[in-house]
């Protein structure tokens, strides 16, 4: 008996250190990937991350299976094997099918899903007989919904050619979103004081999770053009209708997410700090109004202020969450050694507390860093796009993702009042997992579309450059916007852009867009001769230039004097030229 106890303690202690080490290494590699420039090194890191994911799943599930006997143990072992086989094979398949995908983002998604699989399995399979009977099918449902979501992620990029047309469907997205929320408000049964879900074939869906995607698409489409006062007011009214319906449904967590996404996307589109300040003021007024109008908001604020005075009733949930986080310490109690099921609705609303109790504070910190890595990665993609529709959608998805994490972790740690939202990709909940995977799947689709267009243009440009060099062709100075004062050298990006800026390309070209040191998502038209896609998707290129070393190396005056690039500015064509030079 003593030997068995010793072996159990040894296995648990070893497991928690190994789990933390594996997860920490995976997260560190995700951050190091920002500095990787060589394709071979990048592929090697991807493979290492896949192996780490498999090792994490094997080690964590073996620890749980060590204490789960009988049919439940066999069920857990089989489920673990299916999870490993599916995730690893799917990561390889995604790389093969979508060679230009952002695989580090996809790897992060799969690792977060793995943490969720382990946590949900532990809660379901190891506990009281009553708890196991109640939650026994949750790990299987979680795996099924995650698998379906990943399959959608695989399929979505095949429709990338249609994404550009969605910028004209803003009203349609808004109408669909408002209609879906209104129907649920009218027909959904009340659950925990809110009317936000309905059940089909044993699966409970929360439509507001999917409406988030329509909502971001609606805002991106409506704000991708010129943001006039009239348009801003119109968009604000439609966004407010979404929020009001959610408030009427008592889904205040989702209402808060919708409002913050609207505010940040409008701020990005307008570029005005006054918009952000006005939005914050409006949000403060709304928070006070909610506190005065809704009794359950008052209860949650009172719980947040001092849950331990109400520990026997309303404060029990958050008090148990605080106990769990503090009890776990730095390294955690070890899988199966905590009491996560003592927290009501732990698998959906308090997953971060359960993970911190058994896997430790260090593991949870790295978990948050991995979530932050996803946010930074998506934000960097948004900043790299010149296409406003691409930029706004990606930015909205990033804000939606990180703000939901802030709400759930902040609520569980008593940093802010509870909102009842899930931890994306980790908490139990089919709607949450499916909608998050769909939202991030569109982010991947936009990235693939951008990379393909950039690669297609660069291939065409290199071919033209080689042809110009072979023929020793002079620069084309016809219709020179500078009246011949400043001309590109033969074969330079500007020479190529100016020579081909005809009707087949659909708009003006900027020097900034075709700098060899910068990539721009500005290639979407079809060349009349070859059918290849390259040319601007939109003609509203920025006219405020940036100073980059060497950006004027390809320029010279017609009398042979070199052009230094000092005191530069841009004209309405977007071309750089010396300050004071007239057209």
Language model features with spans:
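Hydrophobic alpha-helical transmembrane segments
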Residues: 14-21, 322, 434-442
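TM-adjacent membrane-interface loops and short helices in multi-pass inner/ER membrane proteins
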Residues: 307-352, 362-363
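P-loop potassium selectivity filter motif centered on the GYG triad
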Residues: 217, 223, 320-334, 424, ...
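Transmembrane helix boundary and interhelical junction motifs in multipass membrane proteins
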Residues: 251-256, 331-335, 345-348, 416-419, ...
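Hydrophobic alpha-helical transmembrane segments of multi-pass inner membrane proteins, especially
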Residues: 72-127, 132-314, 353-411, 438, ...
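Transmembrane alpha-helices
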Residues: 2-97, 113-118
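Short capping/connector residues at structural and topological boundaries
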Residues: 203-205, 210, 257, 335-336, ...
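A juxtamembrane structural motif centered on a specific transmembrane helix
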Residues: 61, 408-583
């Amino acid at each position: 008996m003593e030997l068995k106890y010793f072996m159990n303690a040894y296995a648990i202690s070893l497991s928690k250190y190994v789990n933390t080490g594996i997860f920490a290494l995976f997260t560190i590699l995700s951050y190091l990937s920002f500095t990787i420039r060589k394709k071979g090194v990048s592929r090697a890191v991807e493979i290492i991350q896949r192996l780490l994911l498999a090792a994490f799943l094997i080690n964590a599930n073996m620890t749980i299976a060590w204490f789960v006997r009988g049919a439940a143990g066999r069920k857990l072992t089989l489920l673990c094997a299916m999870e490993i086989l599916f995730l690893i094979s799917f990561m390889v398949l995604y790389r093969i099918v979508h060679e230009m995908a952002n695989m580090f983002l996809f790897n992060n998604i799969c690792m977060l899903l793995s943490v969720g699989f382990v946590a949900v399995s532990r809660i379901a399979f190891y506990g009281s007989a009553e708890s196991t009977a109640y939650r026994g099918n949750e790990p299987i449902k979680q795996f099924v919904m995650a698998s379906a979501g990943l399959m959608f992620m695989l399929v979505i990029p095949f429709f990338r050619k249609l994404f550009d047309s969605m910028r004209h469907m803003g009203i349609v997205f808004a109408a669909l979103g408002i209609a879906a929320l209104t129907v649920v408000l009218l027909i959904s049964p009340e659950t925990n004081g809110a009317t936000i879900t309905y059940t089909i074939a044993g699966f409970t869906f929360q439509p507001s999770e999917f409406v988030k995607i329509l909502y971001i698409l609606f805002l991106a489409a409506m704000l991708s053009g010129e943001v006039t006062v009239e348009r801003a007011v119109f968009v604000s009214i439609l966004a407010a209708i979404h929020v009001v319906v959610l408030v009427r449904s008592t889904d205040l967590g989702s209402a808060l997410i919708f409002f913050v996404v609207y505010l940040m996307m409008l701020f990005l589109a307008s570029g005005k700090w006054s918009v952000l300040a006005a939005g914050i003021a409006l949000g403060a007024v709304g928070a006070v109004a909610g506190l005065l109008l809704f009794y359950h908001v008052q209860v949650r604020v009172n719980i947040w202020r001092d849950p331990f005075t109400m520990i026997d009733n309303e404060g029990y949930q958050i008090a148990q969450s605080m106990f769990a986080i503090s009890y776990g310490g730095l390294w955690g109690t070890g899988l199966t050694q905590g009491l996560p099921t003592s927290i009501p609705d732990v698998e959906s609303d308090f997953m971060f507390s359960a993970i911190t109790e058994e896997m430790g504070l260090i593991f949870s910190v790295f978990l948050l860093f991995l979530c932050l890595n996803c946010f930074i990665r998506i934000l960097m993609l948004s900043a790299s796009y010149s296409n406003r529709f691409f930029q706004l959608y990606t930015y909205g998805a990033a804000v939606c993702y990180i703000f939901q994490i802030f709400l759930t972790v902040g609520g569980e740690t008593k940093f802010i009042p509870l909102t009842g939202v899930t931890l994306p990709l980790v908490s139990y909940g089919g709607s949450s997992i499916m909608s998050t995977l769909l939202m991030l799947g569109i982010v991947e689709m936009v990235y693939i579309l951008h990379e393909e267009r950039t690669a297609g243009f660069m291939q065409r440009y290199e071919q033209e450059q080689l042809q110009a060099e072979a023929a020793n062709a002079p620069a084309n100075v016809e219709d020179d916007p500078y009246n011949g004062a400043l001309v590109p050298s033969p074969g330079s990006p500007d020479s190529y852009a100016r020579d081909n800026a005809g009707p087949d390309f659909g708009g003006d070209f900027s020097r900034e867009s075709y700098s060899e040191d910068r990539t721009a998502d500005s290639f979407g038209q079809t060349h009349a001769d070859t059918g290849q896609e390259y040319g601007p998707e939109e003609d509203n290129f920025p006219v405020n230039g940036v100073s980059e070393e060497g950006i004027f190396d390809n320029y010279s005056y017609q009398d042979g004097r070199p052009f230094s690039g000092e005191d530069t500015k841009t004209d309405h064509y977007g071309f750089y030229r010396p300050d004071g030079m007239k057209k």
